[in-house]
Amino acid sequence: MSKVRLYEIAKELGKESKEVVARAKELGLDVKSHSSSVEADAGERIKSSFTKAAAPQAPAEKPVAAQPSPQKTPAKEAAPVKAEPTEAKAAAQPEAKTETAAPVKRPQSRNFKAEREARAKEEAERRKQQGNRKPQNKEQGKREDRDNRNKNRGNSNDRDRGNRPNDRRDNRGQDGRRNGQNHQGFNGQKRQQPQGPKIDFKARAAALKAEQNAEYARSSEERFKQAQEAKEVMERQNRRKEQPKAEAPAPVQPAPAPSAPAANPSPAPAAVDTRRKKQARPDKKRDDFDREEEGPRKQQKNRSSQNQVRNQRNSNWNKNKKNKKGKGNNNQAPKPVTERKFHELPTEFEYTDGMTVAEIAKRIKREPAEIVKKLFMMGVMATQNQSLDGDTIELLMVDYGIEAKKKVEVDTADIERFFVEEGYINQDALVERPPVVTIMGHVDHGKTTLLDTLRNSRVATGEAGGITQHIGAYQIEESGKKITFLDTPGHAAFTSMRARGASVTDITILVVAADDGVMPQTIEAINHSKAADVPIIVAINKIDKPGANPERVIGELAEHGVMSTAWGGDSEFVEISAKFNQNIDSLLETVLLVAEIQELKADPTVRAIGTVIEARLDKGKGAVATLLVQQGTLNVQDPIVVGNTFGRVRAMTNDLGRRVKVAGPSTPVSITGLNETPMAGDHFAVYEDEKAARAAGEERAKRALLKQRQATHRVSLENLFDTLKAGEVKSVNVIIKADVQGSVEALSASLQKIEVEGVKITIVHSAVGAINESDVTLAEASNAFIIGFNVRPTSQARQQAEADDVEIRLHSIIYKVIEEMEDAMKGMLDPEYEEKIIGEALIRETFKVSKVGTIGGFMVINGKVTRDSKVRVIRDGVVIYDGELASLKHFKDDVKEVTNGREGGLMIDGYNDIQVDDTIEAYIMEEIKK
């Protein structure tokens, strides 16, 4: 016999394939899907089952429940809407026993107990008809049972919860009991298969599945209707927007239902017939909607019963999940698409080498993908994180029509640029500033006395040894105008400090004593002033002394290029007496006159820049720096970079020790707040914020450290011999601590200049501040001694130095330090000796004694021969042996020496070849004093 496929039967009947598959399974046929083939007679059975279900019946009364049979109605035909739920079942099975019941007010409620009893009776009858029919493939039957159980779980989750909220709890209870019965029945069949009557679980599962499909069809039908209504509403709204004057379209009406026999016509049966007719007719939109719903149904079939309970209780959770997947959300209006803003291209683009594609895209407000595409068209393969060179960036900007300009990199750590940058100072904001005057001269020529007279204070009395140890900055007022004075030391050791003073000054006052004349440091001060191109005012001091000769001073200065205006030069000469305050006013007037000629101006509106005059480490305040503001205005709390250090101006004091908040141009102030002590002579600059100042200071410190490491001496083939030779030179290790940075520099330079052959000075460490415990520890480890200049050790450092036997030498005058270091270096040398001949003796007789050696009898012919002297044996004018005496006797007595004209006996240690007429020359090694 020929076979026919299920989907062909469905097409012939106008039914869906899944309904035909479900009906075939209810009839006990072994089918899996719509592609399964059945015999022709089986196909006729399936067709007849649908024909019987569609036959009309006279509903004399409304049955409440009917006996279920294996031929269940299709899922779509059993979907009641606003009608009694058991009417379709009664029509499909007219021969079933029915029970009359009162009409139910809620059409959604069902009598599941009556349905189960009817199904049980029908299954018993069918077992009698089928007999002992068994599945041909036992394993296949087990697998189908498992599939049916999974479908039962999944389909139970697809029931309509929104339209039937009252049946939710009942459905869960009934489904749970049915699942439990199915599990128990399956397990019992597996364990006790030979015992008792056999139950057709396949038919039971098919019946349960048909019931669940019917419930799902009802919910699916309503969701489809809601979706259609939402689409119609959206279409009407869109048509109103496009054609405001057009009439709104009429809502789509469902197709008229065919007439069905009914005892009491009512709207509810008509609604049922309408949906049945609509379901029977193939509809493309309906099929599409069902296919959309098929995906979630398939996913829900394999969920556990626990998830089913959760989904039934929390309907919002399930709705949200469907909305996330885009299903069942057709009634919501779509969100308007955000239009992308269009940004115009800039006219100019400032770039730097190494910019990435992403950075360029952000600057020109374009997508990185667009730039990558343009680069690809230009032949450049790049990603958005790849850096581009300058040429590629320029070509890219040409493609966009943008003018490309390369950004000039500014070294933020470079302070010197503020002093040479033309645009830093505003020429329109320049104002007159006080002149900065530096007082220079030789030692004890009266520089500090002159400044003391100017300031009416007793600074000079506090200077040790009558010389200025470090620079001082002071400000006085004359005729309503301020003058800033810098005092520099005159000692030879302070050359660097004098040069520093000349570099920041506007006018130099050269103090020369009328009785001493021009001295070495006077000449040096002249050279510093000429190198800095600073005008010189000569103050001839000590004119009150009896031996003063100003004319001789003028002549000596003329020899060194300092010509008086009276002699046709450009230097002013003023004869003064600083001690007796003579002609001091004339000197100040001359200073103001020269300053007026120079037209000294500064811009107080910019951030302050200047030079460090002096720096020291205070125990309570930390690093203290004396600054001279050259441009701008310095304020308290300004972020500042000083040399290789940085910080914020915490406090600011003037030359009188008073706290100030503002310091203008040409004003000397002392500040605190730096992280380290800077070097004297360093430049400083105020930055816009503390972050920038910190970055610049750290970068400058890093560069200084790198420069110091690069300057480290390395051994090469050229200097290998010098290195080996230097190893023979002894070294004196020194640690220098002073009160100010200038004194540290002067001491270091002076000690390095000391030349003693065979000895060199190694400065292990130098810093400002008191001698502390770490200095003592370093000195003990490096075998050095500590020199303290105008500082004292702390009590803990002193105790530690005594315990570790570390020598601390304290001084307040620099030339005494130099003299002491010279003596120490000379004492480090090995002593030198010279030979001194003390006598001669002539051998007259020799005596050979066994076990003793040869004894030579001699007579001293010149000088003397001592026991501890060395002797040479000279024979025929040739030195035969040079050694020491083993014994010296006069007759039988041991003696220390034998003088001229006397006789004695001697033995030479290690030499017995003494002969008559040999000359014995006695000598000693005498140390040479240095």
Curated annotation (Swiss-Prot):
Record's compositionally biased regions (Pro residues): 251-268
Composition skew (Low complexity), residue ranges: 52-103, 302-318
Region: Disordered, residue numbers: 27-342
Signal peptide location: none
Subcellular location: Cytoplasm
Stretches the record annotates as G4: 541-544
Chief location bin: cytoplasm
Family note: Belongs to the TRAFAC class translation factor GTPase superfamily. Classic translation factor GTPase family. IF-2 subfamily.
Name used for this protein in its record: Translation initiation factor IF-2
